[in-house]
Amino acid sequence: MAFKHQLILSTAILLAVLAAASASFREQCVPGREITYESLNARREYAVRQTCGYYLSAERQKRRCCDELSKVPELCWCEVLRILMDRRVTKEGVVKGSLLQDMSRCKKLTREFIAGIVGRE
């Protein structure tokens, strides 16, 4: 009986630790904190340049994108790409849709490019 209570207590503690870690992760990868607005725009321009042929030279965009990404904790990189592809958050915290919404004719290609970056097919 004591073993059963100890197991339940251990499980409860483990779940509490996991919940706290999950909340901490979500709070850390928030635009305006660890993810800067400048870094989101640098990645947007690079992704669009790679797939649509717009903006500055590819090498300059790649360098800017990588420089900005290096300032963000690695655990936030996937969140950065998700924000880039799925929504845009202004400095005021307003969600404005996708950062690539204005590039609708290239959106499918850009999504495929971003998926390749994170290792998905």
Swiss-Prot record:
GO annotation, cellular component aspect: extracellular region
Signal peptide: 1-24
InterPro entries in the record: Bifun_inhib/LTP/seed_sf (IPR036312), Bifunc_inhib/LTP/seed_store (IPR016140)
Annotated GO MF terms: serine-type endopeptidase inhibitor activity
Keywords: Protease inhibitor, Secreted, Serine protease inhibitor, Signal
Source organism superkingdom: Eukaryota
Compartments reported by the entry: Secreted
Family label: Belongs to the protease inhibitor I6 (cereal trypsin/alpha-amylase inhibitor) family.
Protein name (Swiss-Prot/TrEMBL): Trypsin/alpha-amylase inhibitor CMX1/CMX3
UniProt organism field: Triticum aestivum (Wheat)
